[in-house]
Amino acid sequence: MKPIFVGDVVGGVGRRTLASLLPGLRERHEPDFVVVNGENAAGGVGITEKTAREILDLGADAITLGNHAYRHREVYDFLDREARIVRPANYPKGSPGRGHTVVEQGGARLGVSNIAGMLFLEAARSPFSEADAVVGDLRGQADYVLVDFHAEATSEKVAMGWHLDGRVTACVGTHTHVPTADSRVLPGGTAYVTDVGMTGGRGGVIGVRRQDALARFLTLTNVRFETADEDPWLNAVLVEAGTDGLATSIEQLLVPAD
């Protein structure tokens, strides 16, 4: 079984890059599933029903989110209705949406969960105890499990990889928008990478126009951020797994749009 996981899609340039490059990745790698982080799909922050449907229509089997899941109030009801989109599972009970889902293709069932880190981000419950609960909930419902750990601190992400090793197919990090060079299959059979990276304009500062980011750093004023369009790339990982639900390989896919 082979899923592709696409890192944070940032704004319109990210959606256009996904639309341009995903068909070629499908043809080249023949994935069974495509999971996309849509945390920044709408104008660089959050997601809307329109942008979510655009990503789903491109062929995503599931969309994960993160700390900007509720940036746009219009999406609350949609998150309750659309089972293919997951927000952080460790958000408060009663929050719009769901923390995990199961998608099926060709008889294979993939459980997808989104968990938010505690360090420098808001989370109602420990991501580690929530990960235990997710694994328990998905046991028997899914043949494979992919966890998107949306977190800031690399130490917390690495710790989560070890915490889940041997219990899920893949634990992939998102949020920082910078792909890390540590993709590997852990000893217990879990594919891991600290951060997948982003799908968007690499000519800025983690998806924001560089002049906006520099103005904020240089003046400490409240500068309006706009998404960077220059040098768009798609960052993703391709995981392969056996019938036991554990990974055999993970490959980073860092693809320029031009």
Model-derived features with residue positions:
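Acidic, metal/ion-coordinating pockets
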Residues: 1-258
